[in-house]
Amino acid sequence: MTNSRPTPRLSRRTIITGAAGALGLAAAGGTAWALDRYLIEHTDVTSASDYQGLPGTQASGTATATATSAGDGVIEGTTYTSSDRQITITPHSSGSGNSAKAWYVADVKLNDVTALRNAFAKNSFGTNIIEYPTAIAENVGALFAINGDYYGFRDTGIIIRDGVAFRDEPARQGLAIMRDGTMVSYDETGTNAAKLISDGAWQTLSFGPTLVDGGTVIEGIDTLEIDTNFGNHSIQGTQPRTGLGMIAANHFVFVVVDGRSAGYSNGITMTDFAQLFVDLGARVAYNLDGGGSTQMVFNGSLVNNPLGKNKERGTSDILWIGK
């Protein structure tokens, strides 16, 4: 494992610095604003794990929460089985040339959904804070992890992690993983963090869109955009993607589809991604940050091949499960 600096999000950061050079940015204030908004780390909460897992709290407490585990598990290849959790990762591929696709499915069954945890890059909540997924996973003792919603590139959204509200700025369609093991999509602008926690939210994610509801692909997802921030890729077209779905309470599927790599995997459209979850039996499914951020980790190593380059890219958060 390397301790070198995480790869910047080139699709955004290179655009910003490149544009600055091309234009000369005569107004120094414009340069300072861009650096502050997109590159400079801003930490709102340090030692974030000290606050997570405390029911109904805001990120202002001092106690430390620890994940529970039976500790009797066995790893065989990309499968983990214990008395309270099962993880099975399978590779898939189809097509060739420009129609090639490669994806990985993690089928996860838990006795208790609180085994599905969140971790922030550098154990800090804020903006522009990134770290390699394998490094975040190692820091918390994760066996399995996927990239999250990259909350740190935005300052909006309802962000509840491990039962703790870190941000309450409703903006888009969110997803809640409830303490009863179910998943629910919702309009953030119609609720707030306190209400969601009161209703039993364990994790919330703020990216989207919702792909599947009631076992059916959501209509119109092929035209939706999530963020219009400068430097953002469109989420439409054929792209690498990360998502999660719920088959039944405490039974989840996590899917990463590689892309932007000719001959290996071109990626997948939003509608086809949603259909993939339906084919897996998901009743609800939700789209997370994709592109070069699409990354799955198991037992300390990358499972997929981001952008066909076998290289990690720094991200702001992961969802993870321990042994």
Language-model regions: role of each:
Residues Y151-I235:
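Active-site-adjacent helix-turn-beta-strand microarchitecture at beta-sheet edges
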Residues G126-I130, A194-G200, F230-N232, G263-I268:
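A short, polar/proline- and glycine-enriched secondary-structure boundary/capping micro-motif
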Residues N111-V113, Y151, T182, G190, ...:
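Short, glycine-/Ser/Thr-/acidic-enriched flexible segments
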Residues A121-G126, G190-A193, V257-S261:
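Short, solvent-exposed aromatic-acidic interface loops
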Residues D155-I177, D227-R283, L288, S293-K323:
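Conserved, well-ordered active-site substructure
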Residues T2-G174, T182-S185:
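Zymogen propeptides
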